[in-house]
Amino acid sequence: AQFEARPVLETLIDGSLPAFTPHEVVKGGARLLELQGACPFRAAVELRLGGVELEHPAAGIAATERGKLAHAVLQAFWDKAREQSVLLAMTADQRVANVRTHVRSVLAPLRATADAVGTRLLDLEERWLEARVLELLQQDAERAPFTVEFVEEPRVIDVGGVQTRIVLDRVDRLADGTFAVIDYKTGASARPAAWMGERPELPQLPLYVRAIGQEQVSAVAFGIVCTGSTEYRGFARDGEVFPQLKPFDATSAPFTDYASWGDLLQAWNRRL
């Protein structure tokens, strides 16, 4: 009788998550902070429970794949060139040939398994990648002198007692010995305003500044690789170190809450 009287459904409340193990390097990197700031529940589901969002069907190359391809081409170029002077020494034709070689090399594994339609899409992607990378390299050619210190550099960083692994897209050493930290984006929507506020919407670059050491960083930028919008967007300590970026000025937005460039970087570190 007792068995028959049992409830049809039983409720079990378990609000715990898998515990961190000692010295565990938590997956997620900058996305860990991005999700935690926007929605802690989603951060827990995606990064602790392994939940994944369903992919949305799209014509052509998916946005995430396009981003990886652009990163790979730029990495290949700067792995070999390293110095702005090498870029400046190239003729226009040499620059095109160099970039085309890297683009074709990056796309080769995809071409090996593509059908006729896929091959045509990759032809279009090849032209798009080549044009956009050349546009960003032209931006680099117009900058003050620099040397590329790191490309796709892996680091493990401690944030609030949690260790996570990040990859710095690119770090340039400038003429005065300080660093410019660059994060590539293949969408036009990324704005430096996303670094500001108590909960930065896009914390990657503040996190990269922390990894490098804020006292050594004099410029922070998105490298936008996008049709009609390929450019560098970000902030610099002054107008000399990285002329394409907005120089720090405590009397104008968005810097009015900060007494100095160092004060801004310290605020980012504190918020992380």
Q: Can you name each region flagged by the protein language model?
A:
Residues 1-272:
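Structural signature of nuclease core domains in nucleic-acid processing machines
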